[in-house]
UniProtKB/Swiss-Prot annotation:
Biological role stated in the UniProt entry: Binds the lower part of the 30S subunit head. Binds mRNA in the 70S ribosome, positioning it for translation.
TM ranges: none
One cellular component (GO) term of this entry: cytosolic small ribosomal subunit
Subunit structure: Part of the 30S ribosomal subunit. Forms a tight complex with proteins S10 and S14.
Origin organism lineage: Bacteria, Bacillati, Cyanobacteriota, Cyanophyceae, Synechococcales
Record-level GO BP terms: translation
Keywords: Ribonucleoprotein, Ribosomal protein, RNA-binding, rRNA-binding
Family, as annotated: Belongs to the universal ribosomal protein uS3 family.
Region (Disordered): 216-243
Domain of life of the native organism: Bacteria
Protein name: Small ribosomal subunit protein uS3
Organism (species): Prochlorococcus marinus (strain MIT 9301)
């Protein structure tokens, strides 16, 4: 069933972690679940240009902790952290609680072209600019190969190039072992709104395998001759520690 089930949901607890980490009773669970959905929707709409790959949410007592993985952290942080304060007030307004403590950490995506969501976002932007889908897919494959991914699969469906009959086309480079549970598969979906209709985009990225008795995966595109890449930027919010 590896080709039919969601790759991330199939690997929860093996190679994937939950995007939301908190516990709630049966009464408060739907409320907190709606809050998570509102927060992620708000962040994607307001900071879509920042290239946000994922939003991780954790709750401890009355404190809300967010971790934003983005390709351009400077867009979110702003000058002297002014963007963080604006984001915090926006989240408090979204959930309807101005007194809620919100802690925000912004982490830079180390390999932008090896991230499934950012690749899907790039493909969607090109298709919305009316670039031919075959050329767009080829460019995305080249970018991912330069980033050193072990395998990549891209699927686009809809009225491709304005065709009268909708169809689905896909291409694959390298290995994408969807049946292997220890394989770290990064999966993302995206929609491109074109003049001919909506195109659906799916991206699978194979980053390596989690070996037994090891916590770290095989690094993407690792080579013993190459030096380690620079450490990704991380902006940790410590404004609530003194309060």
């Amino acid at each position: 069933m590896g080709h039919k089930i969601h790759p991330s949901g199939l690997r929860l607890g093996i190679t994937q972690e939950h995007r939301s980490k908190w516990f709630a009773t049966s009464k408060t669970y739907p409320i907190l679940l709606q809050e998570d959905f509102k927060i992620r929707t708000f962040i994607q709409k307001k900071y879509g240009a920042a290239g946000i790959s994922d939003v991780l949410i954790a709750r401890k007592a009355d404190q809300l902790e967010l971790e934003l993985k983005t390709a351009r952290p400077g867009v979110i942080v702003g000058r002297q952290g002014s963007g963080i304060e604006e984001l915090r007030s926006g989240i408090q307004k979204t959930i309807g609680d101005r007194t809620r403590q919100v802690r925000i950490n912004v982490v830079e995506v180390e390999r932008v072209d090896a991230d499934a969501f950012l690749l899907a976002e790039y493909i969607a932007q090109q298709l919305e600019k009316r670039v031919a889908f075959r050329r767009t897919i080829r460019m995305a494959l080249q970018r991912a190969q330069r980033a050193g991914v072990l395998g990549l699969k891209i699927q686009v469906g809809g009225r491709l190039n304005g065709a009268e009959i909708a169809r689905t086309e896909w291409t694959r480079e390298g290995r994408v072992p969807l049946h292997t549970l220890r394989a770290e598969i990064d999966y993302a979906t995206r929609e491109a709104n074109t003049t001919y209709g909506v195109l659906g985009i799916k991206v699978w990225v194979f980053k390596g395998e989690v070996l037994p008795k090891e916590e770290q995966t095989i690094p993407v595109g690792a080579s013993p001759k190459r030096k380690a890449s620079r450490r990704p930027q991380q902006f940790e919010d410590r404004s609530n520690e003194n309060s």
